[in-house]
């Protein structure tokens, strides 16, 4: 009984509370990601590789965006009685990058690419299109929690599926 209501509250109320909490952190620190927040999973591995192979230091700006995005995994008080982590929602990453315009533009892009992958899956049958569609479906379903492109393993997995796994043999 109450577990269902607790789960519903968690899934629908926490994103609002934690978005507000982490929005204040971004505003207080005057952080603007300019795309690095939303695409952290793609960008950070490049700098990490350069740091470890060529000893080129990661720019402080990139490290700051990466750190604040990872800090959302820390448990914070979402209400007087509940602590939670990660439920910042996809909107927060777009907010961190370009504030409210970022939310609008980012969600338009997510909608466009979700529709396009759905259409490609319907008209061009194949495991690659279906896999990419599943990634976008996962992103939409879990948009109340976070954005998958901010997680290195998800972003690299997407690149692997899109460009390597189903590469056509000549």
Regions found by a protein language model. Name each.
Residues 83-170:
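Hydrophobic alpha-helical segments
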Residues 1-110:
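Small-residue-enriched transmembrane helix-hairpin modules in multi-pass membrane proteins
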């Amino acid at each position: 009984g109450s577990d269902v209501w607790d789960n519903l509250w968690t899934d629908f109320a926490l994103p609002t509370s934690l978005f507000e909490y982490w929005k204040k952190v971004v505003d207080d620190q005057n952080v603007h990601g300019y795309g690095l927040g939303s695409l952290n999973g793609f960008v950070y591995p490049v700098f990490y590789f350069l740091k470890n192979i060529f000893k080129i230091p990661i720019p402080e700006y990139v490290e700051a965006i990466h750190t604040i995005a990872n800090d959302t995994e820390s448990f914070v008080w979402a209400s007087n009685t509940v602590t939670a982590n990660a439920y910042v929602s996809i909107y927060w990453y777009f907010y961190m990058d370009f504030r409210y315009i970022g939310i609008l533009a980012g969600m338009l892009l997510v909608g466009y690419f979700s529709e396009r992958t759905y259409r490609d899956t319907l008209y061009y049958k194949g495991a690659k299109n279906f896999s990419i569609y599943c990634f976008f479906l996962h992103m939409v379903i879990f948009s109340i929690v976070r954005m998958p492109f901010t997680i290195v393993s998800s972003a690299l997995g997407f690149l692997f599926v899109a460009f390597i796994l189903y590469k056509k043999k000549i």
